[in-house]
């Protein structure tokens, strides 16, 4: 698998041919020589290249949540006045973990208290029990197979046999090739390859089961709110050059996690531009005769910015006509961060005046070309904190800084998503050959050779005198196997010998024949239940089902008669079911097309307020009553001075689109009237009486059963049961494996001396004697002549591939070029590329002046229809010829935000895109002003605490019920958690179209700007 050429490695040596003797007389077939000695183990093979990294294992299930702290008692508190913000207190000492207390009675829900001071982070809590171990990751791919070791050397030939006549027989067959040596020890690991590029972020893994809900902790005392501090701009230091990656060091021992480091210092706040002077209040002139429209004048020059005066804020004059929009200025470098100024006292909020007269819309100026980048200015002196200036352009990205020192190990974070496997890194250099391994264990004993021919039994010799015990001589060659003698008489039973050293276990013998089936044994006692296994990995998400056909819209039912009975008693609160497990995150579908803006509905009339009735029992939420009749329009009040502009509130949710009215007949075109003076906005009519509560709706169908609960902790082991009866003796097992060869026994007594044998025949001529010693060296001869030039040698051994070079420093980003002229040409063919990332939302344009309220339209009658089915897309029309470029028309008014389109069908998963360039980092946006705190709603009384019912199965999350009637205000409780967002309000009256924004979009280098 590595793809290397191993032809350069040393090859096993070849056997040299021996010098042959003269052909001797043909002898008888001698006995087979003993097998040759096993060859020495071959050298250690090279280690193959490292295998590909295995895919990361799946994220293990989340650990069990630690025990909850004791619940706190909710004390009755009264709403306090907003005070000044206090000083942050010192960090408290770490407390001992408290024992979980009993759950207290549910207290009465109080009003939302004021935000307390942000305390310093408490001491780290006691570490919870470790979670269950995660699933083992899939094993990595097997590394490349090492080079085969050298073949064992051929054993030395056995001694030559001799025939009966003494002649040398032919050389016996070569002994069996020795078994291969044991595998060598693994070689040293090769150098670590360079890290491959970071893989794309994988899809989010399945969320672990939600932990049990802890008991509520003790509420801290409500601190007085302080004055809001000035929001400083986030400082950004210049990034240094990237450092050269050092060699990977050996992993050191894991250190003890150090304390959490202190938060870094907040960057200094940048200099803020000076505000412009407030316009002088214009006087309302008399109504003049309408003159003819004159030619358009040149745009006026923008005035210089004045410095802010020390006087109180004057009244705002009427809104003047918007001037021509100037082109964007040259792009300057970001200035140095200035020091934060002193926080001034908050000024009193002035009264809001009536809306000023709407001025005529100014002409839209053409967008200017972006100017060249100016020189970097010197840092200015720290000035007073003024109003926030406009956001400057994004600076060029700095070059990467050198890697800093390794900080202390932080707390262990939650398991991240499973990433895609990164690309395969380059193969590492082959490791050095390992040292010669130890001698391996002896191989299996070879099969016994064929039995030799039995020799003729000689006559028994005379028994000689027993000689003395001689020294142990060398072991002779194995003799011929004699015929088995007759069985002797049975001797006396010897004494039991000492127990020998148990031999090692031999190889298992062949399995014996299967015995007869024994009688069935009695059933054993039931063992204790095993521990519950860990939860397996989540399966792959199933395919999406087909979308069902939309049902027919039913006719609105008639309201049933009102029930005679009052509202029933409030039942005891059931035990909340556990939250179901979060499903796996689906693939992101393609972005649907933006729907067209729907028509804005007519506003409903505002009714007069009715008298406040007595607070009744809380009933079921009824259907909404009809709106009351519109009150009489008040007389226009005197025109007051325009008040200062209030803070920008948060954008409310878009109202539901009303039903379009019937199209009226087209009237005759009347003469063009004169522009009248816009009258002041009349007062808002009083609210109408609240409608009666409708009858209670039918009970909803019972919800589906909830998912199975989380597997509980394994129970304690049960008591050990009584011993069961003895089982029936089973059939005899198969014979055991043959034991290891025993130790060599002691040498026996020397046998009697045999008779002298007959003189044998003469032997064959002996072998050539050994080579004699070398003679003395002779004198040096004359130098020879130079030989001819030799042939070119064979090419050398192919070298190993060199290591990968270090990564070079990234080049500096080039300057942004000027945008070219707007090209005109036919539209190109539609590309087949992948959809790009959705760009960031541009900055909103300046809001136009508020127009006068339109006349209220007729109140629509009838239930709101459901959204119609989405029509099939029509056929694509043929592309017509490109028309001439017309003049740029004026920008139309901003349309009403349309309803959110239905989500499109789930598209196929696209291929992972290429890694894009790092975009320019945007400046942080200005912090919005805090809106006015709404008045807290009244809270109903708490019902009597009923007995705890049995725990039911956890159900699915039910649908949101209708809001009930508001009960009387209860005693103020402790501050609760932030509630969910309320439903969107009814659509407001349609305003007149705003002034032309005159914005334009332009982008470069992947960044999007809105002017």
From Swiss-Prot:
The modification 5-hydroxylysine is found at residue 106. Residues 28-67, 167-182, 292-302, 345-361, 396-415, 520-537, 549-559, 588-635, 642-662, 680-690, 711-720, 774-801, 809-819, 843-856, 872-887 have a biased composition (Low complexity). Residues 981-993 have a biased composition (Pro residues). Residues 1-1011 are annotated as: Disordered. Prolines at the third position of the tripeptide repeating unit (G-X-Y) are hydroxylated in some or all of the chains. Residues 282-291, 323-332, 464-473, 560-578, 700-709, 757-766, 820-834 have a biased composition (Gly residues). It comes from the Eukaryota. It is found in: Secreted; Secreted, Extracellular space; Secreted, Extracellular space, Extracellular matrix. Expressed in bones. It holds the Pfam family Collagen. Transmembrane segments: none annotated. These protein fragments were extracted from an ancient bone collected in Haiti. Belongs to the fibrillar collagen family. This is Collagen alpha-2(I) chain.
